[in-house]
Amino acid sequence: MDISLDESCVALESSVKLLGKTLERLAEQGEHSRRLTSTLLRSKRVFELVSEYDLQRARLDVIEEVEPVVEKLCSKLEKSLNKLERERATLQQTYELNQLRLNNRLAGSGGRRPVVMGTSTTEELGRLREAKQRKAALEREIAEVRGT
């Protein structure tokens, strides 16, 4: 343990000597280049007053950069919302249809069952009326065939 401590001390002393030599060399090199030490290595903060016109121009430039991006994001958001609304309407109709099927299954197959309509267009309602009329006509024909 004493040996490793001695070796550590020797290594530390050599590092300190090497660092001292490096500092001396830097000082010598720095003397040749006063510009480097006086200007480049010194940090200065410069505060300047900016005119109101320049400030407004900078704001307008930022707005001109950001506005197209915001508009694009808004249009994407609107498209996504429309898509989700259509999907919600489809799911609502599917839910109503499945609810109707479940109610019909639970009620059994007795007589006429009431038709529950969700959101329908006039075209769909017209087709439904035509289908009911065809059904009634076919039932009459079946009754006539059985009667004869």
UniProtKB/Swiss-Prot annotation:
Cytoplasm found in the keyword field: yes
Localization annotation: Nucleus; Cytoplasm, Cytoskeleton, Spindle; Chromosome, Centromere, Kinetochore
Gene Ontology biological-process entries: attachment of spindle microtubules to kinetochore; cell division; mitotic sister chromatid biorientation; positive regulation of attachment of spindle microtubules to kinetochore; positive regulation of microtubule polymerization; protein transport along microtubule to mitotic spindle pole body
Chief location of this protein within or outside the cell: nucleus
GO cellular component: cytoplasm; DASH complex; spindle microtubule
Keywords assigned: Cell cycle, Cell division, Centromere, Chromosome, Chromosome partition, Coiled coil, Cytoplasm, Cytoskeleton, Kinetochore, Microtubule, Mitosis, Nucleus
Pfam families named among the record's database cross-references: DASH_Spc19
Signal peptide: none
Domain of life, per lineage: Eukaryota
Residue runs in coiled coils: 68-148
GO molecular function, one term: microtubule plus-end binding
Keyword 4Fe-4S set for record: no
Similarity field: Belongs to the DASH complex SPC19 family.
Function: Component of the DASH complex that connects microtubules with kinetochores and couples microtubule depolymerisation to chromosome movement; it is involved in retrieving kinetochores to the spindle poles before their re-orientation on the spindle in early mitosis and allows microtubule depolymerization to pull chromosomes apart and resist detachment during anaphase.
Assembly: Component of the DASH complex consisting of ASK1, DAD1, DAD2, DAD3, DAD4, DAM1, DUO1, HSK3, SPC19 and SPC34, with a stoichiometry of one copy of each subunit per complex. Multiple DASH complexes oligomerize to form a ring that encircles spindle microtubules and organizes the rod-like NDC80 complexes of the outer kinetochore. DASH complex oligomerization strengthens microtubule attachments. On cytoplasmic microtubules, DASH complexes appear to form patches instead of rings.
Protein name, as recorded: DASH complex subunit SPC19
Organism: Eremothecium gossypii (strain ATCC 10895 / CBS 109.51 / FGSC 9923 / NRRL Y-1056)
Lineage start: Eukaryota, Fungi, Dikarya, Ascomycota, Saccharomycotina
